[in-house]
Swiss-Prot record:
PANTHER family: ACTIN. Actins are highly conserved proteins that are involved in various types of cell motility and are ubiquitously expressed in all eukaryotic cells. It comes from the Eukaryota. It is an enzyme of class 3 (hydrolase). It catalyses: ATP + H2O = ADP + phosphate + H(+). It comes from Saccoglossus kowalevskii. Coiled coil: none annotated. This is Actin-1.
Length: 376
């Protein structure tokens, strides 16, 4: 790109990972954990250059001596001071850009509280002095990335899962459903069921090890009961994992019991429908005339949709809920882990989008509430 100096920045702040890069690129340049870590102990070595806080990968690598906090919970920012640190780290350390020289596209969870949106806008203009910014809904960007304008997106990340029906580019707010069950809950559940096997994982640092086990070894069973029977009768499903200290642990039915909670939240003690039923309920809240288009364009997105077997299982479950003649298509693009970011990159580089940005001037005239008028 020759005009790199005016490229818009696209920042997808997820509960678990932050994805950032330049509009027009086909993948984010920076991907790091949305973590701020603070030392657990008092420093005793002088001149070590110890900091009072660490962000992202650096916090991850020093996790043994830090207390790790995630400023975004269930897709919504709960700690603004830490969030500011993450944005600062994104601009200055990861992308190495001056935010006052680039428009910034941020993403937000559907049904985000209005005050949250305003606060994001305020920080961008007042702390980072961006010339222009925009806030886009994550699921809508995933649909853009799949090349569609109509469909239902089941977006499931680390902190929250949403089903968002979109028709001709418009999200249908009355039919958006939110499920507070996502990757972080699955990590916690895996910690719990591994403890039942006699392995102990308790600290915030150990949780990160379990997250790695989950990402490398878990999968979704097509038929849970049958898979349980197979696991009980043979060791064909067992896998081993080497912990950082060299100890090797074996994991069997936990591999599919963990993500099964997405389809059976009762496993986590939650009284709520699974992701398949939530998707179906969301479709049923839409006008009868557009349901057919939604069934045929069901798009999976987000890191928690990366389990092998999840698309086939969704197909099976939704087929059993929907009318028998209905054509159902589950779209699970291979790059779905980053499809929100990719959609943002596409959107921010469209020529028709350029008049959509909120400029510093508009912000100065109207204040943070401008975001509700300009960003849907």
């Amino acid at each position: 790109m020759c005009d790199e100096e005016v490229a818009a920045l696209v920042v997808d702040n997820g509960s678990g990972m932050c994805k950032a890069g330049f509009a027009g690129d086909d993948a984010p340049r920076a991907i790091f954990p949305s973590i701020v870590g603070r030392p657990r102990h008092q420093g005793v070595m002088v001149g070590m250059g110890q900091k009072d806080s660490y962000v992202g990968d650096e916090a991850q690598s020093k996790r043994g001596i830090l207390t790790l906090k995630y400023p975004i919970e269930h897709g919504i920012v709960t700690n603004w001071d830490d969030m500011e640190k993450i944005w600062h780290h994104t601009f200055y350390n990861e992308l190495r850009v001056a935010p006052e020289e680039h428009p910034v596209l941020l993403t937000e969870a559907p049904l985000n509280p209005k005050a949250n949106r305003e606060k994001m806008t305020q920080i961008m203009f007042e702390t980072f002095n961006t010339p222009a910014m925009y806030v886009a809904i994550q699921a809508v960007l995933s649909l853009y990335a799949s090349g569609r304008t109509t469909g239902i997106v089941m977006d499931t990340g680390d902190g929250v899962t949403h089903t968002v029906p979109i028709y001709e580019g418009y999200a249908l707010p009355h039919a958006i459903l939110r499920l507070d069950l996502a990757g972080r809950d699955l990590t916690d559940y895996l910690m719990k069921i591994l403890t039942e096997r006699g392995y102990s994982f308790t600290t915030t640092a150990e949780r990160e090890i379990v997250r790695d086990i989950k990402e490398k070894l878990c999968y979704v069973a097509l038929d849970f009961e049958q898979e349980m029977a197979t696991a009980a009768s043979s060791s064909s499903l067992e896998k081993s994992y080497e912990l950082p200290d060299g100890q090797v642990i074996t994991i069997g039915n936990e591999r599919f019991r963990c993500p099964e909670a997405l389809f059976q939240p009762a496993f986590l003690g939650m009284e709520s429908p699974g992701i398949h039923e939530t998707t179906y309920n969301s479709i049923m809240k839409c006008d009868i005339d557009i349901r057919k288009d939604l069934y045929a364009n069901t798009v999976l997105s987000g890191g928690t949709s990366m389990y092998p077997g999840i698309a086939d299982r969704m197909q099976k479950e939704i087929t059993s809920l929907a009318p028998s003649t209905m054509k159902i298509k589950i779209i699970a693009p291979p790059e779905r882990k980053y499809s929100v970011w990719i959609g943002g990159s596409i959107l921010a580089s469209l020529s028709t989008f350029q008049q959509m940005w909120i400029s510093k001037q508009e912000y100065d005239e109207s204040g943070p509430s401008i975001v509700h008028r300009k960003c849907f």
